[in-house]
Amino acid sequence: MPRYCAAICCKNRRGRNNKERKLSFYPFPLHDKERLEKWLKNMKRDSWVPSKYQFLCSDHFTPDSLDIRWGIRYLKQTAIPTIFALPEDNQEKDPSKKKSQKKKLKSEKEVCLKAKSEESFASNEPKKHPVNTDLLPEHAELLESSALVKPPDPKAESVQNNILTLSLVKQGTRKPESILETSVNQDMGIGGFHTSFENLSSTTITLTTASSEGIQQPLETQEVIEITTNHLANPHFTNNSVEIKSAQENPFILSTVTQTVEELNTDKESVIAIFVPTENSKPAINSFIPAPKTVEMEEDIDIEDSYKDVDYETEVLQIEHSYCRQDVNKEHLWQKVSKLHSKITLLELQEQQTLGRLKSLEALIRQLKQENWLSEENVKIIENHFTTYEVTMI
């Protein structure tokens, strides 16, 4: 199992470091609370609780805190890591601060987009388009409805037609209660809008169209349609007069379909703003199409890296558990081996000589016993000679 360094700014991992530079990983002192607090304080992660599967690499320890025995580096029991990156680097790499920065950037982009849209409305001259709508059912409840928008398909004709279909579906049912169809023509003209409602309140809906696959497309030209309806005083039957204004804008990115129902008031006028892309919009070819090929390539690279990691881990194990230093030449080692062999042969010769002397002395003692030339004094002298000889031999 590969080991990673638990420090925030450290990317050391067993198997991916330089072969020239040895790395060793040490677990946290979970049983020694005082020492663990010092470790976490130096790491500037006081509230973090490490597990037994997390380690620190040897780069964070001074050479005094490591004990080298037989070519293996052991961590002393009083060692404390002191070498860490600056706090500014940690703040830059803090994920929570990254998220807050991303949120700020998104909000700034939204503000810029709104400002651009307002400038485009003010600068461009409006075009009038006719819109015909029919609301079929009676007593439709807008509070329980949700709007579904289908983006239009462009046609290669001299007259550009864009059709939007809005279906209001009641929650809990599958049948649409009302269908609103708007046809937008780019020919200049004045359009009238007449609808029949029964006991309906006015609404404000803002709709933006985007690709159904979720791919962001830059729209070089875009039509913005604004519909304003004015209610009459008749409580049972209302006629709404509608004006449609469209303006072409510079490249503008629409990423989501937003549908909001803001107000429900019979006394106030309602506004419906619809953003419609024209035929001149050129969808950008994004890099999501060749996704399976990139996935296969990444899988092959990961497999090759795993094999390399296994080979390198075996090499690291052999180096860590070897009983000689790697900077010694082979010739020097062979010289040491030959010297040891010569010493062994000398010891064997000395052993043979001592055995021969002992055998000769034993034969002499037997001969003296047979001839009865031995006395107590002579025996003591011989025993003393044997003891001194054995001591010198040892």
Curated annotation (Swiss-Prot):
Pfam family, one: THAP
Coiled coil: 347-381
Location of region: Disordered: 86-109
A GO MF label: zinc ion binding
Bilayer-crossing regions: none
UniProt modification remark: Cleaved by HTRA2 during apoptosis.
GO cellular component, one term: nucleus
Compartment(s) of residence: Nucleus
Presence of the UniProt keyword Lipid biosynthesis in the record: no
ZnF THAP-type span: 1-84
UniProt xrefs under InterPro entries: THAP_domain_protein (IPR052224), THAP_Znf (IPR006612)
Classification via PANTHER family: AGAP005574-PA, THAP DOMAIN-CONTAINING PROTEIN 5
Subunit structure: Interacts with HTRA2; under apoptotic conditions. Interacts with ABRAXAS2.
Function: Has sequence-specific DNA-binding activity and can function as transcriptional repressor (in vitro). May be a regulator of cell cycle: THAP5 overexpression in human cell lines causes cell cycle arrest at G2/M phase.
Protein name per Swiss-Prot or TrEMBL: THAP domain-containing protein 5
Organism in which the protein naturally occurs: Bos taurus
